[in-house]
Curated annotation (Swiss-Prot):
SUPFAM superfamilies: Prokaryotic ribosomal protein L17. PROSITE patterns: RIBOSOMAL_L17. This is Large ribosomal subunit protein bL17. It comes from Leifsonia xyli subsp. xyli (strain CTCB07). Pfam families: Ribosomal_L17 (PF01196). GO terms for molecular function: structural constituent of ribosome.
Length: 159
């Protein structure tokens, strides 16, 4: 028999939490950015990224699985046709959470969660062969200073 998750839930029961996360995900996909509490944003992030991964697959089964969660055909269509192609090259990290401070009234910590729609720029990897080709010498070459010899000759002349 499956055991329910332990610990506090958003909104009370597990069904309410599922519905709340589905509504937050639908709002995120519709508006590309939403303002909510930090706790809700942190719980929404893996949920939304999983739905985006389904949308990147783009097949009928993935569309039906996302539709079973969100339920709004227009939002699902926008996710599959507009958002998923923009995130096709990205391998994860589709969302960004920015802390905004505290809400007036109940002092709840607020955050903005948004989709990262900027194109991915591949990082330049340093060439390993050039790093190995020029090994550093372990023993530094020390030059003999000329000044101590001149001081000795100056002392010898003074005597």
């Amino acid at each position: 028999m499956p055991q329910p998750t332990k610990g506090p839930r958003l909104g009370g029961g597990p069904a309410h939490e599922r519905l709340m996360l589905a509504n937050l995900a639908a709002a995120l996909f519709a508006h590309k950015s939403i303002k909510t509490t930090e706790t809700k944003a942190k719980r929404l992030r893996p949920y939304a990224e999983r739905l985006i991964t389904f949308a990147k697959r783009g097949d009928l089964h993935a569309r039906r699985r996302v539709l079973a969660v969100i339920g709004d055909k227009t939002v699902v269509h926008e996710l599959f046709t507009e958002i998923a192609p923009l995130l096709a090259e990205r391998e994860g990290g589709y969302t960004r959470i920015t802390k905004l401070g505290f809400r007036k009234g109940d002092n709840a910590p607020m955050a903005q969660i948004e989709l990262v729609l900027e194109p991915v720029t591949p990082k330049a990897k340093p060439a390993k062969s050039t790093a190995k080709a020029a090994p550093k010498s372990k023993a530094p070459v020390e030059e003999t200073p000329d000044e101590p010899a001149s001081e000795e000759t100056a002392e010898a002349e003074a005597d």
